From Swiss-Prot:
Gene3D superfamilies: 3.40.1370.10. It comes from the Eukaryota. One of its GO terms (cellular component) is ribonucleoprotein complex. Keywords: Ribonucleoprotein, Ribosomal protein. This is Large ribosomal subunit protein uL4. SUPFAM superfamilies: Ribosomal protein L4. PROSITE patterns: RIBOSOMAL_L1E. The gene is RPL4. Residues 341-357 have a biased composition (Basic and acidic residues). GO terms for biological process: translation. Belongs to the universal ribosomal protein uL4 family. The keyword Phosphoprotein does not apply. Residues 369-386 have a biased composition (Basic residues). Residues 341-386 are annotated as: Disordered.
Length: 386
């Protein structure tokens, strides 16, 4: 929210004058984009024009079903002959030249009623957002050279009657780049709106809010992107177009001074809106980093645990050799001994097989000469009974 107590009034020459105005309380109101978006979405429906298709559309033909037994669908079919149209399906929404499903009616619920207090809260939030430069720049407005936000000009601007004088004022206030942005953004609309007298679209420019119309509306109305509105006729559709807060606003001094009287303050209610009190923010200070680092909160918090034991992954020593060696260093010797026993057993088994088959078995430690040949002893046949 805007927190400056005084706002400088700039003259129509673009220079800062010696007079200051107090920042109205409405600029310190809480910003609720959710309320603004909902209210804008509902109010935008009130400008729709009812439309409907003709009640006779799709039924201006003579058609009757052929019934069953003809191996064709039971959809009504056009009578007659001698043309391609005869025998074709009609009336159903699945047919060519048919009526639509659920034809639109003019007695649809076009308009929406929004609670009065909800509309006022949305407008107050939109006004408060116009006083924050970061929000205005995020909306796409070119305000890098603007002397101050919110921008307040003297009441002499309300008496301007020529457009060329209005252009000079905008150039002196460094607001002309935002108008140039609007001029460069003009382009053809996507879709069928081009065929319905809505060919071009463009961005939104500054919103000029005045107190008394002494010619200001005729001077500024032909500048691209400029919107003019009386301070007593502020509405959400012009203050937050598209339901997005943060439009660049130029206030006249008389209009800026009337805001406290129109929307009230936290000490007194509004003088022009019956039973309306300015919404109170939930937090007087929205700087969370400053709040969390304050002494009051830091003293109530415990110190962070720096020696916190981290959970390690527990591995199965029966499957992981390194973990087993760390738990039982003798496991390596046991494994080597078991491996040696297994190798000796395999050698003895192979030697027995070689001896039975009459194969020379190489002797360990012998040279590279011929291997020693072992012959099996002949076995004596036992004398059997005849």
């Amino acid at each position: 929210m805007a927190a400056r107590p005084l706002i400088t009034v700039h003259s129509d020459k673009g220079a800062a004058s010696e007079s200051n105005v107090t920042l109205p309380a409405v600029f310190r109101a809480p910003i609720r984009p959710d309320i603004v978006n909902f209210v804008h979405f509902e109010l935008k429906k009130n400008g729709r024009q009812p439309y409907a298709v003709s009640q006779k559309a799709g039924h201006q033909t003579s058609a009757e079903s052929w019934g069953t037994g003809r191996a064709v669908a039971r959809i009504p079919r056009v009578r007659g002959g001698g043309t391609h149209r005869s025998g074709q399906g009609a009336f159903g929404n699945m047919c060519r030249g048919r009526r639509m499903f659920a034809p639109t009616k003019t007695w649809r619920r076009w308009h929406r009623r929004v609670n009065t207090t909800q509309r006022r809260h949305a407008l107050v939030s939109a006004i408060a957002a116009t006083g924050i430069p970061a929000v205005v720049m995020s909306k796409g407005h070119c305000i890098e050279q603007i002397p101050e936000v919110p921008l307040v000009v003297s009441d002499s601007v309300e008496s301007i009657k020529k457009t060329k004088e209005a252009v000079v004022v905008l150039r002196r206030l460094k607001a002309w780049p935002d108008v140039e942005k609007v001029k460069n953004s003009r382009r053809f609309r996507a879709g069928k709106g081009k065929l319905r007298n809505r060919r071009a679209i463009q961005r939104r420019g500054p919103l000029i809010i005045y107190g008394t119309d002494n010619g200001i509306s005729r001077a500024f109305r032909n500048i691209p992107g400029i919107t003019l509105v009386n301070v007593n006729r502020l509405n959400l559709l012009s203050m937050a177009p598209g339901g997005h807060v943060g439009r660049f606003c130029i206030w006249t001094e008389s209009a800026f001074k009337q805001l406290d009287n129109i929307y009230g303050t936290w000490k007194r209610p509004s003088a022009e809106k019956s039973h309306y009190n300015l919404p109170m923010p939930k937090m007087t200070n929205t700087d969370l980093s400053r709040l969390l680092k304050s002494d009051e909160i830091q003293n109530a918090l415990r110190e962070p645990k720096k020696d916190k034991a981290r959970r390690l992954q527990k591995k199965n020593p029966l499957k992981n050799y390194r973990v087993m060696m760390r738990l039982n260093p003798f496991a390596g010797a046991q494994k080597a001994a078991a491996k040696a026993v297994e190798q000796r057993r395999l050698k003895e088994k192979q030697a027995k097989l070689d001896q039975k088959r009459g194969i020379a078995t190489p002797v360990e430690g012998a040279g590279k000469g011929r291997p020693r040949k072992t012959t099996a002893k002949p076995t004596k046949a036992k004398a059997g009974k005849k």
